Amino acid sequence: MPGMTRQGGQVWAHVGQAFRETAYDVVVVGAGRMGSACALFLRQLAPDVRLLLVERGGLPNEEGATILAPGVWTALDVPAGREREAAWVRRALAHDFGNVTFGPRPLLDLHAEEGEGRLPSADLLAQFPEAAGLFDPAALPFARVDLEAATYRPGAVALACGQRAVRAGADLLLNTHAHLTPGGVRLDRLTVTNTHQIVTHETHELHAGLVVVAMGADGPHAAEHELGLHTTHGRAYRQLPRLNTPSTDHTPTLRAGGLILRPQHGGFTLVPPIHHRDPHGYRPTGGRLTGVPVGVRRETLEDLLRLMAALPPLATEALEVGHSLADVPGAWLALPEGRADTPPCHQHLTEGVHLLLGGPLADPLGLAVAYDLAARVAGVGERPWA
């Protein structure tokens, strides 16, 4: 029998659990942060809707861009007019999803030139002594400060949303590759052979009144190749190198030249800027440093080299660049409208199909966009941030 929560949502975790369903009101494809949140909000807003959440992995946060998302909430990244949504997301992260390691952590946005709202960076070292040695005040003499910035674990948010959606009555089908079809989805239930190959064990055709495509960077590609629906969205492959310079719970998040130094696990996770969409057919590959192969892609390597004088720890052995691509964590990231500065969005593609995308600004705005789509599907006009 399928696993069942106390309140009725069923979970199919492996092919040994028979799946006999043939139709749902709503199928959400992809249980990352955006898909899991949308499923949860829809169950809360429309509890009579039969909903299935489908995930290729074995957990709602097992793989993809969500597990590698920076988890940095900052008002500095929020487009004008979206401030209330971002504030609602911050409150939700702090109170609504249990332990997602949410915590206030000021962000110092460092600059070489003076500008509106920027303070002398050297003066900030008295307030943030943990930042001493992380940047050169002579090279980056100005900074904007977001005292309300915070950090959290997006993967934990996705897992919490998935679990709560099931407790609220949603069904969850794991280890399943979903293909978009007219009027529904085709489900390939996956299993692993004794030679460690992932193969299709069985296939099901499922009718759905509405399909929410929350497949991250794979979503636009699936819409085009499986339904013939062209979109303007793109994707980029982002790596997150490790910097083993010590950090503490009091170390602020730093950003310079678009590069984020996110304190994590006693060191730093580096979040490089995304300059443009990757071309169709691009395959991630490591670059070369003075002729030596490294795991960091060339574009990211150039960003790190450019900032080494301003951020001295980058020029030390604390920076891990790896020997091959497999040494550096990375994932494909959706780019709404093909741009790195476009906020998350949802889009009606055709009758019965909606596309839901997070992207680079999912940390401060993703949950609000997922809620907005759920409310539209449920026919609810009010928004909690309005």
Language-model segments: what does each one mean?
Residues 100-109, 115, 126-168, 351, ...:
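Helix-loop-beta segment of a Rossmann-like dinucleotide-binding subdomain
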Residues 145-206:
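Helical element adjacent to the flavin cofactor pocket in flavoenzyme catalytic cores
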Residues 69-136, 258-260:
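Dinucleotide-binding Rossmann-like beta1-alpha1 core, especially the glycine-rich loop
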Residues 1-26, 44-49:
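Extreme N-terminal leader/targeting segments of oxidoreductases
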Residues 37, 63, 74, 91, ...:
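Flavin-dependent oxidoreductases
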Residues 309-386:
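C-terminal catalytic lobe of FAD-dependent flavoproteins
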Residues 44-65:
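Glycine-rich FAD pyrophosphate-binding loop
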